[in-house]
Amino acid sequence: MASLSGLASALESYRGRDRLIRVLGYCCQLVGGVLVEQCPARSEVGTRLLVVSTQLSHCRTILRLFDDLAMFVYTKQYGLGAQEEDAFVRCVSVLGNLADQLYYPCEHVAWAADARVLHVDSSRWWTLSTTLWALSLLLGVARSLWMLLKLRQRLRSPTAPFTSPLPRGKRRAMEAQMQSEALSLLSNLADLANAVHWLPRGVLWAGRFPPWLVGLMGTISSILSMYQAARAGGQAEATTP
């Protein structure tokens, strides 16, 4: 009953619904792609699952029409990252926020062109939005790698003379942060693989993924994202008096 209540509570929020729609969409694409490619007798079921996946993706695209303001507020609050101690983290975070901020209007124009609201070439705008998404993911990968390197160095650095070792609580916090960064790294890499696939042919492995592989990468990323969100929520509850 507690887990059911937790799920219902998560679905009351926009982010909770978006995560569920995302994981369901990619799971449908994964299973549908496998059935179409490997099980001819079940190809009709696979095709239907791929249609469901497409519709769920379209649903998320429409819901993102309202994300610009939230992203702008976050970008404005972060600013130039004055609260960050590390200059590299500050730089990649600011660039990532800029890429994310530009991504949304580009996707909106592409969607409006497909819906024939605007008379422009949608393919160019889809390519631009996907490129911005890939850039944001690449910056996220660079940030996570840098953070993992720095945290590992701090944990393994020998204790200087006349200084006390790291307190157990701080060490555990750093280890938890390393785990979080590792999960973010894996999630971003999985999404980056799909982002490159959706770029125009001729760019690395663009257009070469079968539907099931796109579904697999997206499912991995979605599950990791949901796990991180649940973990963060649990930690927040644990620290609440």
Swiss-Prot record:
Family designation: Belongs to the peroxin-11 family.
Membrane topology note: Multi-pass membrane protein
GO cellular component, one term: peroxisomal membrane
Transmembrane regions listed in the UniProt entry: 125-149, 212-227
Compartments, record wording: Peroxisome membrane
Lumenal topology ranges: 150-211
Pfam families: PEX11 (PF05648)
Record protein name field: Peroxisomal membrane protein 11C
One of the protein's GO biological processes: peroxisome fission
Record topological domains on the Cytoplasmic side: 1-124, 228-241
Assembly and interaction partners: Homodimer. Heterodimer with either PEX11A or PEX11B. Interacts with FIS1.
Keywords: Membrane, Peroxisome, Transmembrane, Transmembrane helix
Predominant localisation class: membrane
Function: Promotes membrane protrusion and elongation on the peroxisomal surface.
Underlying gene: PEX11G
